[in-house]
C-alpha cells in the first residue's frame, strides 16, 4: 500500500530565472549569492523564496465544487501559521495558493515565492484525499500545516547534513519503496541529499 508522502516541488530550470527575479522584486533579501542559479534539486529550499518579514496575505483557490466544510477546515489549519508569523490565508477566486486534490498525486507544494511563477491555471499544492474530508483532525493538522509551511518557504528539516549523515541509505530505499513506491532516485533526492546550508 502506498501512503501519500510529501514531495516539495521544484520549478523547472526554464522557470528559475523568472522566479528568482520575481522573488527579489517581492523581497530584495531573496537575491542569490553571486547572482547565480544553484543546482535545480536545491532551488526549492533556499532562502531565496522567502516572503519577508513585513507579512503577507495569500489567497487560496479551491477546485470548483469543493465542499465548504473542506475549504473551512483547510483554511483553519493553514491559518494556524498566523499564531507564529505575520501571515494569513483567505479563500479567493484568483489565489496565489491553488489547491488540487489529485488522486495518486500525494501531498506536495511549491516553496515560498515560487508559487508566484506558476501559471494561474495550475495548482501550487496537492492534498490527495482531503476533498472527501473523512480523516481525523490530527491528520488535517499534520498535513495541512506541513504543506502550508512549504508554501511559506520552509524546507524539510530532515535534509540537514547532520541528519542525512545518520540515515542508512539501504534502509531508506527499502522503507520508501514499500510505503510510498519511491525509486532510489526519489529517495536520493528527497531524503539522502543534504541541503546546501549556506543558502538556507
Please give the residue ranges for each predicted region.
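Zinc-dependent metalloendopeptidases
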Residues: 1-200
Amino acid at each position: 500500500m502506498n501512503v501519500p508522502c510529501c514531495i516539495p516541488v521544484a520549478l523547472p530550470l526554464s522557470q528559475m530565472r523568472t522566479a528568482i527575479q520575481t522573488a527579489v522584486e517581492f523581497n530584495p533579501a531573496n537575491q542569490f549569492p553571486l547572482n547565480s542559479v544553484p543546482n535545480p534539486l536545491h532551488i526549492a529550499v533556499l532562502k531565496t523564496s522567502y516572503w519577508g518579514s513585513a507579512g503577507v496575505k495569500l489567497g487560496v483557490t479551491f477546485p470548483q465544487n469543493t465542499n465548504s466544510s473542506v475549504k473551512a477546515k483547510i483554511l483553519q489549519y493553514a491559518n494556524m501559521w498566523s499564531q507564529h508569523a505575520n501571515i494569513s490565508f483567505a479563500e479567493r477566486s484568483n489565489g496565489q495558493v491553488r489547491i488540487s486534490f489529485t488522486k495518486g498525486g500525494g501531498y506536495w507544494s511549491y516553496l515560498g515565492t515560487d508559487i508566484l511563477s506558476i501559471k494561474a491555471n495550475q495548482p501550487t499544492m496537492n492534498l490527495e484525499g482531503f476533498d472527501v474530508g473523512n480523516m481525523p483532525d490530527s491528520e488535517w493538522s499534520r498535513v495541512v500545516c506541513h504543506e502550508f509551511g512549504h508554501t511559506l518557504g520552509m524546507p524539510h528539516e530532515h535534509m540537514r547534513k547532520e541528519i542525512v549523515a545518520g540515515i542508512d541509505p539501504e534502509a531508506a530505499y527499502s522503507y520508501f519503496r514499500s510505503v510510498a513506491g519511491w525509486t532510489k532516485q526519489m529517495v536520493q533526492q528527497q531524503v539522502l541529499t543534504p541541503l546546501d546550508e549556506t543558502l538556507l
